[in-house]
A protein has these predicted regions:
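Short helix-loop-beta junction
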Residues: 47-55
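Divalent-metal-activated hydrolytic enzyme cores
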Residues: 1-27, 60-66, 73, 77-78, ...
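Ordered, amphipathic secondary-structure segments that act as subunit-interaction surfaces
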Residues: 77-88
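N-terminal short beta-loop-beta anion/metal-coordinating cradle
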Residues: 13-17, 22-48
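Divalent metal-coordination and catalytic microenvironments
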Residues: 11, 32, 56, 85, ...
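Gly/Ser/Thr-rich loops at beta-strand to alpha-helix junctions
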Residues: 36-39, 89-93
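Short glycine/serine/threonine-rich phosphate/pyrophosphate-binding segments
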Residues: 40, 65-68
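Short hydrophobic segments within beta-strands
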Residues: 33-35, 86, 149
């Protein structure tokens, strides 16, 4: 049985007790951008319930044009007002450089990716960079409540980056 088949069986059990549709806008008016790392259960880390927040994930939890697009939709069309950023210790994005990664892909495929992997060397600095990208974006109208954190994968604690 594949992992997907197991997840489909889990969904059958979930659907049996599903409470029904929730409103489209998040009830807490929050958008979270976090790393896709499987060790981060964003809902548990923040104590989020279903329907409370938009959770946007990518490699590193970095702010790219696509995250700006998602945040603009979240704020402009669905009423979110707060943004929470979550990076984490022991992140894979700390283990390589963009140039090395792109070079390896080019060596393998013959094509150098046009996109940036957005690897970084310093967690706190990258959180600050992500906040700065949001603040600089004309597409994000609500910028009063943007906070960034580093999740410690050993202790389970969030540490705010200032």
């Amino acid at each position: 049985m594949s992992a997907t088949d197991e997840y489909l069986a889990n969904n059958e059990r979930y659907a049996e007790t599903f409470a029904g549709p929730l409103p489209l806008p998040p009830s807490r008016h929050v958008a979270v951008v976090a790393c896709m790392d499987a060790r981060l259960n964003v809902y548990a880390i923040l104590g989020l319930g279903e329907g409370e927040a938009h959770v946007i994930r990518n490699a590193g939890g970095v702010i790219t044009d696509d995250e700006i697009r998602s945040l603009a939709i979240s704020q402009r069309l669905l009423g979110t007002r707060e943004i929470i950023l979550i990076h984490h210790t022991d992140c894979g994005m700390l283990t390589f450089t963009d140039d090395d990664f792109k070079g390896a892909i080019q060596d393998e495929t013959g094509i150098k990716p046009a996109w940036s992997a957005e690897a970084f060397r310093d967690l706190d600095e990258d959180v600050r960079q992500s906040v700065a990208r949001i603040l600089a974006s004309p597409f994000i109208p609500h910028k009063d409540e943007i906070r960034g954190f580093v999740f410690d994968v050993i202790t389970g604690k969030l540490n705010e980056v200032s």
